[in-house]
Amino acid sequence: MSLLPLTPSLRPFLEEYLPRPCSNRPFVTLTYAQSLDSRIAAKPGEQTKISHLETKTMTHYIRSKHDGIMVGIGTVLADDPKLNCRFEAEDGNISTPRPIILDPTGKWAYHKSQLRSVCDNNKGLAPFILIDETVTPRNEDVEVLDKQDGAFVRLPLLRNADKVGNWNIILKKLFQLGIKSIMVEGGASIINDLLVYSKIIDSLIITIGPVFLGKDGVEVSPSGHAGLIDVKWWQGIQDSVLCARLT
């Protein structure tokens, strides 16, 4: 399905929250769609439509401004996402951000995924798959990634109980690999972690759909108080979009 045209008012609205150069780590944008009751899915592992096609175009526009798109293993197993960018710039160029999959224990069979097909068809880049240094990836996945110029990135993710420390390790390594900006899209555990770590997140962009998903839904909420500054709102055909920075 082709994207709707980008609503013109979104460009100036988003501008100050898009990546700018950072000296020693990637610029990190946390962005996701949620219901009015702060749920991102109706049930664990269930793909749930929340946002309008208008803000789907916005998501691809934001992707076009980043070097990488990060999701966790839960999102990958539930949604089998394509993680490419389909927004076409005015000059006809389509950006190719690098998919980044956080999969510490090596659960994902990449060679069977939609993303593998996307890369085979030259419609996106092969992923960097972040695994713990003790994990041995599947031979099939290694072979496919080698051909597509993707990679398994081994990091000490499981031995470190300090989640902030883990994120610093991840961001430092990705910066060394040439990823200067990252759009983090989920899932819930990653979102909930990062909402607490204000020094890691540079911009927060939340799409809010006019729906309640109920108490059985997958909730996103920080474990403690998290304040926002530089807050701006945008109202679309159906959805509201919040842009802000964490204090």
Curated annotation (Swiss-Prot):
Does Transcription regulation count among this protein's keywords?
no
Q: Which reaction equations make up its catalytic activity?
A: 2,5-diamino-6-(1-D-ribitylamino)pyrimidin-4(3H)-one 5'-phosphate + NADP(+) = 2,5-diamino-6-(1-D-ribosylamino)pyrimidin-4(3H)-one 5'-phosphate + NADPH + H(+); 2,5-diamino-6-(1-D-ribitylamino)pyrimidin-4(3H)-one 5'-phosphate + NAD(+) = 2,5-diamino-6-(1-D-ribosylamino)pyrimidin-4(3H)-one 5'-phosphate + NADH + H(+)
The UniProt GO MF terms for this protein read: 5-amino-6-(5-phosphoribosylamino)uracil reductase activity; NADP binding
Single Gene Ontology BP annotation:
riboflavin biosynthetic process
Query: Binding of NADP(+): at which residues?
Result: 75, 79, 165, 187-191
Pathway listed: Cofactor biosynthesis; riboflavin biosynthesis
Keyword list (alphabetical) reads: NADP, Oxidoreductase, Riboflavin biosynthesis
Superkingdom, according to UniProt?
Eukaryota
Q: Which InterPro entries match?
A: DHFR-like_dom_sf (IPR024072), RibD_C (IPR011549), RibDG_C (IPR002734), Riboflavin_Biosynth_HTPR (IPR050765)
UniProt EC number? 1.1.1.302
SUPFAM superfamilies in the cross-refs: Dihydrofolate reductase-like (SSF53597)
Q: Its biological function?
A: Catalyzes an early step in riboflavin biosynthesis, the NADPH-dependent reduction of the ribose side chain of 2,5-diamino-6-ribosylamino-4(3H)-pyrimidinone 5'-phosphate, yielding 2,5-diamino-6-ribitylamino-4(3H)-pyrimidinone 5'-phosphate.
Q: Of which family is this protein a member? A: Belongs to the HTP reductase family.
What NCBIfam families does this protein's entry cite? ribD_Cterm
Which PANTHER family does this chain map to? 2,5-DIAMINO-6-RIBOSYLAMINO-4(3H)-PYRIMIDINONE 5'-PHOSPHATE REDUCTASE, DIHYDROFOLATE REDUCTASE FAMILY PROTEIN (AFU_ORTHOLOGUE AFUA_8G06820)
Subunit-structure text? Homodimer.
The name under which this protein is listed is 2,5-diamino-6-ribosylamino-4(3H)-pyrimidinone 5'-phosphate reductase
